[in-house]
């Protein structure tokens, strides 16, 4: 699916190009480049590289109102080339400070950016 092949960008121009053979929609490429880490130690930086962000399965918890993203090694392989860190094959609570609320989600599916063993950015399916 084309949307699953489109990935987000994080910090360095060296990571701004997609892996070989992955088609890029120019409009979506610009959208991903516009996403910034909303808060925390990486605030203001680009959310992700093409290797770090994916559409993910998400659930909400009625008790705490938080999002949980399923982070698995099939979606985020740790082959050493992108610095994903270990994918726990588990539901991971999305920290409130990494949720992007200021723009719509053009993919229509939840996006999580998993980098160095943590979620750096998250865009809900509905966006704002």
Language-model regions: role of each:
Residues 11-13:
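N-terminal signal peptide c-region/cleavage motif recognized by signal peptidases
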Residues 65-74, 121-124:
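Generic recognition of long tandem-repeat/solenoid scaffolds
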Residues 93-95, 101-128:
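C-terminal partner/receptor-binding element of secreted or periplasmic proteins
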Residues 1-7:
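Sec-dependent signal peptide recognition
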Residues 69-106:
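Short Fe-S-cluster ligation motifs
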Residues 17-70:
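N-terminal secretory signal peptides
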């Amino acid at each position: 699916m084309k949307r699953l092949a489109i990935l987000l960008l994080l910090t360095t121009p060296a990571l701004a190009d997609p892996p070989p053979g992955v088609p890029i929609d120019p409009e979506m490429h610009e959208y991903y480049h516009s996403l910034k880490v909303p808060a925390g130690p990486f605030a203001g930086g680009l959310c992700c590289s093409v290797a770090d962000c994916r559409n993910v399965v998400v659930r909400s918890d009625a008790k705490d109102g938080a999002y949980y993203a399923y982070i698995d090694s099939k979606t985020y392989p740790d082959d050493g080339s992108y610095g994903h860190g270990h994918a726990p094959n588990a539901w991971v609570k999305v920290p409130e400070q990494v949720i992007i609320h200021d723009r719509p989600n053009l993919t229509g599916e939840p996006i999580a950016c998993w980098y160095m063993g943590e979620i750096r950015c998250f865009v809900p399916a509905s966006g704002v």
